[in-house]
Amino acid sequence: MINLRKTHPLMKIINHSFIDLPAPSNISAWWNFGSLLGICLVIQILTGLFLAMHYTSDTLTAFSSVAHICRDVNYGWLIRNLHANGASMFFMCLFLHVGRGIYYGSYLYKETWNIGVILLLTVMATAFVGYVLPWGQMSFWGATVITNLLSAIPYIGTTLAEWIWGGFAVDKATLTRFFAFHFILPFIIMALVIVHLLFLHETGSNNPSGINPDSDKIPFHPHYTIKDALGWMLLLLVLLFLALFSPDSLGDPDNFSPANPLNTPPHIKPEWYFLFAYAILRSIPNKLGGVLALLASILILLIIPLLHTANQRSMMFRPVSQTLFWILTANLMTLTWIGGQPVEQPFIIIGQLASILYFSLILILMPLAGMFENYMLEPKR
């Protein structure tokens, strides 16, 4: 009997992507995050769909509809907590996935990397518009502050901001369109994920050594399906722990108050996963400069493949680059901390120094380290 999974037009695609896919024999747990992100996306879409059934995108009822979901809908509190904390898990996996790509030189698969950066931006946009929907104080003021940044664009800025708002300030029209965006974007993300995988399967996976693994490949199933399943269980364990025992620990207390345009919260700040970019934005006193730095902090990922100077792909055998990579990691944690602090000394100067170090590491120090390592590996007479 002919094996159906190898002949059926649809099953054949799944078979070549997840079952008989030749995978390097030495990929570590750092390669689990792709599948974990897939699981996160599915969880977010399913929980989001059930939330959308009960949510109303109107300024008068949005806040109370979220309260209604938590109080009156069967397991509504659980669905909402899973969705809110699922976003945090999503970004945690995203940052680790990108970090893995930088450490092991996966960015040299340029198409896959570029689609990945577009995916990151799309997920960030989705999370931003989603945070506005509960229409609490931080939702409203976060939306006001971030959309206001568009007005820094010369000539067309104010018009652009009012166009996004659908009026002269963040109001009913803004909330309605943000709900529409928040609903459609995850499906766009799903399409981009398929393109991301399509490009990845053109080249095959990278591996920790950075050496071409073609001479030693193993089938994806059962080796990596089992390994991924362990990752899913650990992810669900952490997510359920967060959602059941500490659902509000990553949120902002101000969001328990309904949005009030007449009362500004003392410290306006986004969710934790945007704090590093927010710190870079705030570290520049000029509004337009801050917006450009904010964009550059993410878009800099697009030029990382061009800054690769080392003869080796992976950082596995490059101690100088490794040191700089972990300094970059610590620097991003510092920026995340600074983003949540008030705008006063010493936080201002720490944020400015951390921002300078962030760009210096990626644009100058890491390429120089690659060149230095090449020089050190050259045979000397």
From Swiss-Prot:
The keyword Ribosomal protein does not apply. A ubiquinone binds at H201. Its cofactor is heme b. It is found in: Mitochondrion inner membrane. One of its GO terms (cellular component) is respiratory chain complex III. It is a multi-pass membrane protein. Its main location: mitochondrion. The keyword Transcription regulation does not apply. Keywords: Electron transport, Heme, Iron, Membrane, Metal-binding, Mitochondrion, Mitochondrion inner membrane, Respiratory chain, Transmembrane, Transmembrane helix, Transport, Ubiquinone. Binds 2 heme b groups non-covalently. One of its GO terms (molecular function) is ubiquinol-cytochrome-c reductase activity. Heme b b562 binds at H83, H182. The chain crosses the membrane at residues 33-53, 77-98, 113-133, 178-198, 226-246, 288-308, 320-340, 347-367. Heme b b566 binds at H97, H196. Pfam families: Cytochrom_B_C, Cytochrome_B. PROSITE patterns: CYTB_CTER, CYTB_NTER. Component of the ubiquinol-cytochrome c reductase complex (complex III or cytochrome b-c1 complex) that is part of the mitochondrial respiratory chain. The b-c1 complex mediates electron transfer from ubiquinol to cytochrome c. Contributes to the generation of a proton gradient across the mitochondrial membrane that is then used for ATP synthesis. Heme 1 (or BL or b562) is low-potential and absorbs at about 562 nm, and heme 2 (or BH or b566) is high-potential and absorbs at about 566 nm. Belongs to the cytochrome b family. This is Cytochrome b. It comes from Sminthopsis murina. The gene is MT-CYB.
